[in-house]
Each structure stands twice: as structure tokens, then as C-alpha cells.
Regions:
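FIC/Doc superfamily catalytic core
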Residues: 1-168
Length: 168
């Protein structure tokens, strides 16, 4: 499903470059990206299609993290607010980093939040004229630590610095 989601991201990037505002693209396609990630599981009858429709309806916990994502009853409003933030923010790097961080902070789905957030970040970066960022396997712990600090200590600085090192 990762490849199908990647193809959707490429199509989204094309639409943004052709004039669709990036924040509107985020609002329009973030759920589709998530669905595409898990489409092979639906085809294999591992997941019911209904399980991928909309946001999560249950609590979710992140293994190894002290951050507890928002309660399921708050997800819809939080995502609506994130969509508005993405529409209003003009700076591509700010949109990319905040979009990624706030998305994983909310954790709107039961699974696939990190992968979806990285697709969001990259679509915002690429359409802003920056390179696609890949989190190297050997830096995954640093990435997770930076997200943990941002989520638990309300300090996004380390996460911003981490992403900046990947942009160089």
C-alpha cells in the first residue's frame, strides 16, 4: 500500500504545482493517502473497508511513548483545525513541519499515522521547492526522540532542527 499512497502523493504534488493551494490539497487528500496505505490489507480481507473510513473511534497508544494522543471524541475537531492551519500557512517549511508534527500528535488513525505524516511533510516540502526528505534508518531513534520531546515537553525545536539537518 505504501507504493499506492506514494503515487497519490505524486499526483497531489502535481495538482499543487498546477495551482491547487497546498492546504486545500492536504484537506482533500490526507484520508485518501491513509486508505491507500492499507488497501492491500482490505484486498486480502485482513481489514474491513469500513475500518478505514474516517478517523479512529477508539483510544490509541504509541508504543514506547509518554505521549497519549487525543481522545477519539476530539479527533474530528482537531483535524478540522489542522486543515484550517494548513490552508492559512503560506511558508512551505512551516506547513511541512507543523503538518507532520500536529498530525502525529493528534494520531487520527489506529495505524499508519507516521507514514501518512511523512507523506504530508514531503508533499508540502516538494511543492515549496525543497527536496523529498527520507528519515534514514540509522537516525530513526533521533527522529522518534525529537517527536517525543515535541509531544511531551511541548517544544518542537529539536524536531525542527532534525528535519533541517535532512534538508541540507
Amino acid at each position: 500500500g505504501y507504493y499506492q499512497s506514494y503515487l497519490l502523493v505524486k499526483e497531489t504534488i502535481k495538482q499543487i504545482l498546477e495551482g491547487l493551494p497546498a492546504g486545500v490539497a492536504f484537506d482533500r487528500y490526507h484520508q485518501d493517502r491513509h486508505f491507500e496505505l492499507f488497501e492491500p490489507c482490505v484486498q486480502a480481507n485482513i481489514i474491513a473497508p469500513a475500518d478505514l473510513m474516517g478517523y479512529r473511534n477508539h483510544p490509541v497508544y504509541i508504543r514506547g511513548s509518554r505521549h497519549t494522543p487525543l481522545p477519539e471524541r476530539a479527533v474530528r475537531d482537531a483535524m478540522r483545525t489542522l486543515c484550517e492551519l494548513m490552508k492559512e500557512e503560506e511558508n512551505a517549511i512551516v506547513r511541512a513541519i507543523l503538518g507532520h508534527f500536529v498530525f502525529v500528535y493528534i494520531h487520527p488513525y489506529m495505524d499508519g499515522n507516521g507514514r501518512t505524516a511523512r507523506f504530508i511533510m514531503n508533499s508540502m516540502l516538494v511543492t515549496g521547492g525543497y527536496d523529498w526528505v527520507i528519515i534514514p534508518t540509522e537516525r530513526r531513534e533521533e527522529y522518534m526522540r525529537a517527536l517525543e520531546i515535541a509531544s511531551v515537553e511541548n517544544d518542537i525545536t529539536k524536531f525542527c532542527e532534525f528535519i533541517a539537518t535532512l534538508l541540507k
